[in-house]
A protein has these predicted regions:
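Heptad-repeat alpha-helical coiled-coil signal-transmission segments
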Residues: 3-6, 10-13, 17, 24
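Metal-dependent catalytic cores of enzymes that make or break cyclic nucleotides
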Residues: 19-212
């Protein structure tokens, strides 16, 4: 086998192993979210819309693909949250909210140590998707561009998803109300560049709620 053919085979096998690893993690993430209300399609919707926004932002094809594939793992840390909190039908207490917030650090620990750009992106997303542009998020209170770019995208999409679907303690918002809220929070909760890309997709007639 020639050196070039060997290099190609090694690259192919590395990709196969990465895909196998990713599939296991995706199944774990799906298991974590399946305990919640209407959570089965949530990871797929987040992955699809995050990829579309990243593409609209003009990011490279590789980065777009990594975000699309890594985004469904954003809440993998929910696997470590007790059923008593995950399945609660009323608003969480302050103590329960503190426990729920640990899912980001749990998720980052699960994903830590990945050698590929994809898994490293997934780790950053898991840890930082609840950070907010003005620094009022968690776990580290990061602000602006200190928040990893992938997490800024997925954080906005995750918020959009949460608002447009029923939760035990509140009904879903309408699409129109949610889009208006996202627009109003440009430069507030969310990165203005991410919001701009999201609104362009909306104006272009893209189905923002599909998982396909």
């Amino acid at each position: 086998m020639s050196p070039s053919a060997l290099d190609q085979r090694v690259a192919e096998r590395t990709r196969e192993l990465e895909n196998e690893h990713l599939e296991v993690l995706q199944r774990l993430a799906a298991t974590a979210e399946f305990r919640g209300q209407e959570m089965g399609e949530h990871p797929r919707r987040v992955g699809r819309l995050s990829g579309l926004i990243a593409e609209q932002m003009g990011l490279t094809a590789e980065v777009v693909d990594n975000i699309r594939r890594a985004a469904p793992l954003h809440d993998i840390g929910l696997i470590g949250i007790p059923d008593s909190i995950m399945l609660k039908q009323t608003a969480l207490s302050e103590q329960e909210q503190r426990i729920m917030r640990t899912h980001v650090t749990i998720g980052a620990r699960i994903l830590a140590g990945g050698q590929s750009a994809l898994l490293q992106s997934a780790e950053r997303i898991a840890l930082s998707h609840h950070e907010r542009w003005t620094g009022k998020g968690y776990p580290d209170g990061l602000a602006g561009e200190r928040i990893p770019m992938e997490a800024r995208v997925v954080g906005m999409v995750d918020s959009f998803e949460a608002l447009t679907h029923d939760r035990p303690f509140r009904p879903a918002w309408s699409l129109q109300k949610t889009v208006a809220f996202i627009g109003d929070e440009s430069g507030g909760l969310f990165d203005p560049t991410v919001v701009s890309a999201f609104l362009k997709l909306r104006r272009a007639g893209v189905d923002l709620l599909s998982s396909e």
